[in-house]
C-alpha cells in the first residue's frame, strides 16, 4: 500500500511538471513586430499565418511599432522580438550606418547577413520580391499625351507640367532636388501637397506629376502610371525578414518556413494588397490569408 502511495505521489508530481512545462512553452511564442504602415501589417499577418500552420508554433504579433526601425532594432537586440519585416537599405543605412550605393543590389543581402550576424547575432532570410522605394507618378492620360515611360521622357516635357509633392520630399536632398538634378527636370511650377492628398490632386488635375512609393495602394489602379527610374537614381528598399539567430535555433522549423516568403511578391502585387486594405476596407489578416491561399502556401 505504501509503495502504491509513493508511486501515486511520483506520478502526480510528474504530471505537475509536465503541465508546468507545457504552460512554459505556451508562454514563449515567436514574437513578431511590424512598422506602422499598411503593407507591414499584411506582411506581419502573412508571417504569422505561415509560421502557425507550417510549424505549429504559437505567434505573438505586435503591429505598428512607433518609430519603425529606430525602435524595433533595439528591441530585437534585447530579445523583445524574434523577427520582423525590414527593408534592405533601411538596415544598411539606418542600422549599420553605411552610405547608399556602397554595394550593389546583388551584393546587398549577403552583406547584410554577414554584418548582422557579426554585430547582432541576427540574419536576413529571403527577399519577398518587391521594392518599396520612391516613385515618380503621373496620370495615365498625361503619360499617353506626352508619351511618358521613363523619367528621362519626363525631363523633355517637364517645363509644361506641374509637380506636386509633400514638403519633406521636396526639401530633402535625396528627394526632389536630387531627382531634378539627376534628370534635368525643370517643372512649370512646384506645389506643396499634403502627403495624403497627392493622388487626389493628381486625379483632379491640380498637378500633373507627384512623388509616391512603388507599393502605394493607388498605384494598383490603372488611372495612374509609375515612370521608370531609367538612370537608377533611387535607392532600393527590398523587403526581407530579419530574425535573431537564437530564435532559429530554438524553433527548428522556423528558417525553412521564413524561406517560403522568398520571391512571392512584386511591387504590383504589394500595391494591390495595400489597395484592398486601404481602399476596400478589408482586414489585413483576411487579405494575407487570401493571398497565401492563392499562392498555395496555406492549406486552409
Describe the residue ranges of each PLM region.
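C-terminal motif of bacterial Sec signal peptides marking the signal peptidase cleavage site
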Residues: 17-21
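Short, well-ordered beta-strand elements
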Residues: 25-39, 57-64, 159-165
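Short helix-initiation/N-cap motifs at beta->coil->alpha
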Residues: 38, 61-74, 91, 167, ...
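Short, polar/charged alpha-helical segment
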Residues: 38-58, 76, 81, 177, ...
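Beta->alpha turn/N-cap motifs
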Residues: 65-68, 79-92, 108-109, 138-139, ...
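Ligand-binding pocket segment of bilobal, Venus flytrap-like solute-binding proteins
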Residues: 82, 159-230
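Ligand-binding "clamshell"
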Residues: 95-106, 110-125, 206, 218-232
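A conserved helix-loop-strand patch within extracytoplasmic ligand-binding domains
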Residues: 106-162, 245, 263-267
